[in-house]
């Protein structure tokens, strides 16, 4: 099947690499033009290197190689004004908006009683408030278009269950579910659907780094990806250690397409069965 989102425009936050880049490519493969946003800068409380302007440029290159249009802007999802300006610029150039992937997110770790105040605030501001900002900026365009639309928010298995040493992450990702369900109710009269995705570990830079490995192996001084592999696999029901970004992108494509035209308010795990363990 091809052209599943032909002629539509998708707004993706966190689009410079990882799941966001994968979403941009997968939607472009099926006919969508892309508005891509990423901070392309480091957040001090994040323990791994974040995306760069070169990463965002690579996303542009890969989308354009598919003969689709893309408008890419550096913006911080914590800054509503900047995010709205980025989206408005994209809509002005591409002419419409149909799909929103509120995907930007960070990870950091520590016992709840020991988290720094700024670490907590950064997590909530990016992983929860940032998703609200993306939706808030998009809603007027979706309503004005009169064609309905699809908002897909990236949560996590941590939005469905608890994990130790990640209270701020778990709180933000659970909060996303409440946001999604409320938006689904509010926007249903406009035929705008809102759903959330809940991945297990994904093979991206946000997961494949030593600080994340240490979360799952606190007794290992310098854990490697090979150390992490069996520990990660034990979290999933299916015998795999992690999923690939395209696995999440395929689920997002389904929710964005007319195949899911009556699906709204759903928490969709793409997690190799992690949520049922």
Predicted regions and their residues:
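Substrate-binding pocket helix/loop in short-chain dehydrogenase/reductase
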Residues: 63, 111-112, 116-124, 232
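Active-site helix of classical SDR
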Residues: 135, 172, 180
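Short C-terminal tail/terminal secondary-structure segment
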Residues: 161, 239-240, 252-253, 264-277
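Short, small/polar-rich loop/turn modules that mediate ligand/substrate recognition or access, typified
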Residues: 188, 193, 263-265
